């Protein structure tokens, strides 16, 4: 039986491999989402979070293989239609998921990003028509070296902004939408001893003890650190436990770093698109719906970064602004295509 399966796989052409990888990517991302949610419901079961992480890595590799097979089959980088761009966006989100997880060590990253990846892959694999899932020759407007430069950078920018915005939404959930005072500044620059790299719980970040601060500074405490039972109970400001406040600070700073990564990519992508538009259509800017919403997206996240850098915003207010940006990115990427008009209308199937 196994030999027959191997023989069948060996005899598949690239189109059949793409269809198989399409379905495998959906199954793995769905499994990762369920594992992450199971780990959230039962935080004592560390294996669930580890399986969720393994699922996201597997989904990332599967989608990379799918895009590579499509690239070889079509002879061009696979970003010519909505199906291909959806899979590239999902791949970018899984990659940035791993980066955000490395920065934060919080399972909230997977709880929030895995459903988005699953939804994107399900939409591409199950909703889009089959003829769009087959590689087609490039339309004349896309036969340019600017295709990879512009579209790739824009989709990576969308991925970074979406993951950063999702972590801002996580911040609002953790703090229950309350205004809280975070110990770090808006830039996330603060002397903090390293957190223990154990498997995180819902409140995975703990406050450092005085002894750990001394050890981090290269000093030794004159006496052993008191145990948690010996320490007096700490009041929880704003009625939120200390552990949640520490987790909220991690989410806030990680969100800020991802948006700080996505914004320059968005800027470069818009500039590259303007240069390409001038070559293809004779004008740098034509107020096409996609161009207009790209500008709106840029302004929203420019306001976010301006408020954090120059006004010192942190916590609830920038999180609300980033949450607004989450919806704006989706309108820019997908929503305007429902209009069925404009220079970017080839991205939809109606």
From Swiss-Prot:
The chain crosses the membrane at residues 23-43, 47-67, 82-102, 108-128, 153-173, 258-278, 293-313, 319-339. Pfam families: Cytochrom_C_asm (PF01578). One of its GO terms (molecular function) is heme binding. Disulfide bonds: none annotated. It is found in: Cellular thylakoid membrane. Keywords: Cytochrome c-type biogenesis, Membrane, Thylakoid, Transmembrane, Transmembrane helix. It comes from the Bacteria. GO terms for biological process: cytochrome complex assembly. InterPro entries: Cyt_c_assembly, Cyt_c_biogenesis_CcsA, Cyt_c_biogenesis_CcsA/CcmC. Its main location: membrane. It is a multi-pass membrane protein. The keyword Transmembrane helix applies. GO terms for cellular component: plasma membrane-derived thylakoid membrane. Belongs to the CcmF/CycK/Ccl1/NrfE/CcsA family. NCBIfam families: cytochr_II_ccsB (TIGR03144). Required during biogenesis of c-type cytochromes (cytochrome c6 and cytochrome f) at the step of heme attachment. This is Cytochrome c biogenesis protein CcsA. It comes from Synechococcus sp. (strain JA-2-3B'a(2-13)).
């Amino acid at each position: 039986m196994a030999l027959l399966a191997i023989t069948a796989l060996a005899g598949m052409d690239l189109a059949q491999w793409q269809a198989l990888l399409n379905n495998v990517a959906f199954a793995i991302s769905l499994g990762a989402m369920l594992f992450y949610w199971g780990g959230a419901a039962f935080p004592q079961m560390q294996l669930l979070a580890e399986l969720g992480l393994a699922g996201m890595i597997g989904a990332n590799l599967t989608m990379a293989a799918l895009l590579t097979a499509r690239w070889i089959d079509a002879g061009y980088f696979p970003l010519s239609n909505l199906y291909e761009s959806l899979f590239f966006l999902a791949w970018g989100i899984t990659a940035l998921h791993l980066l955000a997880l490395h920065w934060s060590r919080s399972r909230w990253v997977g709880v929030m990003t895995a459903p988005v990846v699953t939804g994107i892959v399900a939409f591409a694999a199950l909703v889009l028509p089959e003829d769009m899932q087959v590689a087609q020759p490039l339309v004349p407007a896309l036969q340019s070296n600017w295709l990879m430069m512009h579209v790739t950078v824009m989709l990576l920018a969308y991925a970074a902004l979406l993951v950063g915005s999702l972590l801002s939404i996580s911040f609002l959930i953790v703090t229950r939408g309350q205004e809280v005072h975070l110990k770090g500044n808006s830039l996330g620059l603060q002397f903090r001893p390293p957190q223990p790299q154990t498997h995180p719980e819902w409140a995975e970040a703990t406050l450092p003890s005085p002894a750990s601060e001394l050890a981090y500074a290269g000093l030794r405490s004159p006496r052993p650190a008191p145990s948690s039972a010996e320490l007096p109970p700490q009041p929880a400001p704003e009625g939120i436990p200390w552990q949640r406040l520490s987790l909220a600070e991690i989410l806030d700073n990680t969100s800020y770093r991802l948006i700080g990564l996505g914004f320059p990519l968005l800027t470069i992508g818009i500039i590259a698109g303007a240069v390409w538009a001038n070559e293809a259509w004779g004008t740098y800017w034509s107020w096409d719906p996609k161009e207009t919403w790209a500008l709106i997206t840029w302004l929203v996240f420019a306001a976010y970064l301006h408020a954090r850098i120059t006004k010192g915003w942190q916590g609830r207010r920038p999180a609300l602004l980033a949450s607004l940006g989450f919806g704006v990115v989706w309108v820019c990427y997908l929503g305007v295509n429902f209009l069925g008009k404009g220079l970017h209308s080839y991205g939809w199937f109606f």
